Amino acid sequence: MNILSLSECVDRLRKNLVIAYPTESVLGLGCNPESIDAVKVLLKLKKRKLNKGFILVASHFNQIRSYISESKLSIYHKKILYSSWPDTITYLLPAKSFVPDWLTGRSNFLGIRISAHNGINKLCSAFGKAIISTSANISGRNPCRTYEEFLKQFGTTVPILCGPLGTRKNPSKILNIINGSLIRHG
């Protein structure tokens, strides 16, 4: 297994490379959301198409401000966000017009989660911004819940920030903040 320290993982993110890391429920794959080159590597690893979009995780709200159109959020929406984060809930928020299609999946929304997971918070804080977060699995397979499962699917090609997984059994719930629709059960 290719295990890296926090600072080594941050260095890889800054170099627009992909890393693996523990999340609230499964191992995740992540990269710099502003690098199409990093996103292409991530898509190739997962054998996934570009049109699905991605979730961004962050350690605090300021790390995602540049991506979302706050003017489209009412005071009520903001109260929901501020009262429910940090947590395992991912919200689809109105994206600013310049946010790339590879993040939004060609929609007007972007999946955002302010995580309560200590490892994610340390990673995003050290990187200084949000990162892409997607489950560590090849498309169509189950997400990796152990480092052994990760090695079976990806070998040693992707370095890992080791740490404890959260205690959640399922990936995050996804809700559209504007209309309240449930996109994915958590």
UniProtKB/Swiss-Prot annotation:
Keywords: ATP-binding, Cytoplasm, Nucleotide-binding, Nucleotidyltransferase, Transferase, tRNA processing
This enzyme's EC code(s): 2.7.7.87
Coiled-coil residues: none
Any Pfam family matching the protein: Sua5_yciO_yrdC
Principal localisation: cytoplasm
Compartment(s) where it occurs, according to its Swiss-Prot or TrEMBL record: Cytoplasm
GO biological process: regulation of translational fidelity; tRNA threonylcarbamoyladenosine modification
YrdC-like domain segment(s): 3-186
Catalytic activity: L-threonine + hydrogencarbonate + ATP = L-threonylcarbamoyladenylate + diphosphate + H2O
Keyword NAD annotated: no
Enzyme class: transferase
Molecular functions per Gene Ontology: ATP binding; double-stranded RNA binding; L-threonylcarbamoyladenylate synthase; tRNA binding
Any one Gene Ontology cellular component term annotated for this protein: cytoplasm
Keyword Nucleus: no
PANTHER family: SUA5, THREONYLCARBAMOYL-AMP SYNTHASE
Annotated family: Belongs to the SUA5 family. TsaC subfamily.
Function: Required for the formation of a threonylcarbamoyl group on adenosine at position 37 (t(6)A37) in tRNAs that read codons beginning with adenine. Catalyzes the conversion of L-threonine, HCO(3)(-)/CO(2) and ATP to give threonylcarbamoyl-AMP (TC-AMP) as the acyladenylate intermediate, with the release of diphosphate.
Protein name: Threonylcarbamoyl-AMP synthase
Organism the protein comes from: Buchnera aphidicola subsp. Baizongia pistaciae (strain Bp)
Lineage of the organism: Bacteria, Pseudomonadati, Pseudomonadota, Gammaproteobacteria, Enterobacterales
